[in-house]
Amino acid sequence: MAPAEVRTGTGPGRIVVAVYAVLALAATGRSILQVTSYFERAPLAYVLSAVAAVIYIVATAALAKGGAVGARVATGAILIEAVGVLTVGTLSFVQPDLFPDKTVWSHFGAGYGYLPLVLPFVGLWWLHRATRGRATTADDRPPGVSSPGGPDGA
């Protein structure tokens, strides 16, 4: 399969994209309200809610776009999402004073049915499934690296 043929937003991937889109909308709405109305209550928590919203938007767009570039961007965004939800989730339990108000990722996304905790792993699984078995083409290899069998591919 050529790089442009990586399809992350088709088949069951449509569900993954839809869930990311819903979470992107929810996180964006929540963070806008928190930052514009209550910022002084919990600035760190609210900024992290806004960061989560941006990450969900990037992941949604990249998953929907597909292709080799879309898959790489989605993988990066989802890895950041996973680290973020695990870090913020842990900190919200061990240092609750840092998170005096609820955010998307606090308590591992308890306010969202723990979807923020599960979603990055579902997203990474889907990306792996969508890109596995894809033939490596010259476009995927670093400069100067020929095919495994040599210049003629034999």
Residue ranges and their predicted role:
Residues 1-23, 153-154:
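Cytosolic juxtamembrane helix and N-cap/initiation of the first transmembrane helix
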Residues 12-16, 31-52:
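Transmembrane alpha-helix entry/boundary detector in multi-pass membrane proteins
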Residues 27-34, 80-96:
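C-terminal TM-helix exit segments that contain a strictly Trp-centered aromatic cap at the helix terminus
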Residues 33-38, 95-105:
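Membrane-interface helix termini and inter-helical loops of multi-pass transporters
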Residues 55-65, 123-126:
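Alpha-helical transmembrane segments in multipass membrane proteins, preferentially the mid-helix core
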Residues 61-85:
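Loop-to-transmembrane helix junctions at the membrane interface
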Residues 102-122:
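Individual transmembrane alpha-helices with interfacial aromatic-anchor signatures
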Residues 127-141:
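Membrane-interface capping segments at transmembrane-helix boundaries
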